[in-house]
């Protein structure tokens, strides 16, 4: 059975510089920690929600360990300096998947996201494998049945696989099917795609679905297609698979990228989405702390998360 738990207060610790000045603060001092899942108490804030699940990665024959990512990322975020926007973060705890019930975990995340969005919160989910995306995206679609919701995925993989069961490789096919069921258009764009990591069958599926694709080798000039995607929708769900980054910047994922898109380039794309005024939901997925012996990969992911919370308009 899937369960919710508040985040441990021991995760949010860091250096206390408040004796220097009243505004010499770090995230551990400005993040609100909620003892209960009560999004209605935090309207117009950003819900920080963990999805402790890697069952989809296991089903996709990947390297398990992403279930430990939400808490590892909180630790890495905690000691970063708090600037504009960071005091909007409210830690609403973790949804913890109980293997092998991936579908139950995705439904729990879907319900939690819908409830947050309907309470006028925006959602920032820390995965988990990329199976996170179906629960997160479905909750957003449920909350805004009449909006044109655009999905922007920064990822080496299209994740449109055909499979008998949900995996970390199927979330956008599942969301496409959900859009069909809800009789709405499927707006999906994937930036950073590695042609070497996606079969022709996946490429064909993307073409049939009208997916906007920008390959990893073309992301230096991705601002124009990104602007077109942003202009074409009402609300945006941004999902960042950390394997979009090069292996030398992000080795701690299930499938490290041989080429990837450098962090500085990814940050420019993310900033454009954050500044659009349309960003409603974001997640970072596939971080695997088992392969982060020195903590550097967690710091890379945390820096990206810090930038999102800071720049989110």
Curated annotation (Swiss-Prot):
Enzyme kind, highest EC tier: hydrolase
Instruction: State if Cell inner membrane is listed as a keyword.
Output: no
Q: Which GO terms describe its biological process?
A: L-histidine catabolic process to glutamate and formamide; L-histidine catabolic process to glutamate and formate; putrescine biosynthetic process from arginine, via agmatine
Pfam families per UniProt: Arginase (PF00491)
Name the coenzymes or cofactors required. Mn(2+)
UniProt-annotated binding residues for Mn(2+) 2? 155, 157, 241, 243
* Keyword Metal-binding set for record: yes
This entry's Enzyme Commission designation comes to 3.5.3.8
Q: In which pathway does it act?
A: Amino-acid degradation; L-histidine degradation into L-glutamate; L-glutamate from N-formimidoyl-L-glutamate (hydrolase route): step 1/1
Cofactor: how bound: Binds 2 manganese ions per subunit.
Where, by residue number, does Mn(2+) 1 bind?
130, 155, 159, 241
- InterPro entries in the cross-refs: HutG, Ureohydrolase, Ureohydrolase_dom_sf, Ureohydrolase_Mn_BS
Q: Which GO terms describe its molecular function?
A: agmatinase activity; formimidoylglutamase activity; manganese ion binding
Q: Which family does it belong to?
A: Belongs to the arginase family.
Q: What protein name does the entry list?
A: Formimidoylglutamase
Identify the species of origin.
Answer: Citrobacter koseri (strain ATCC BAA-895 / CDC 4225-83 / SGSC4696)
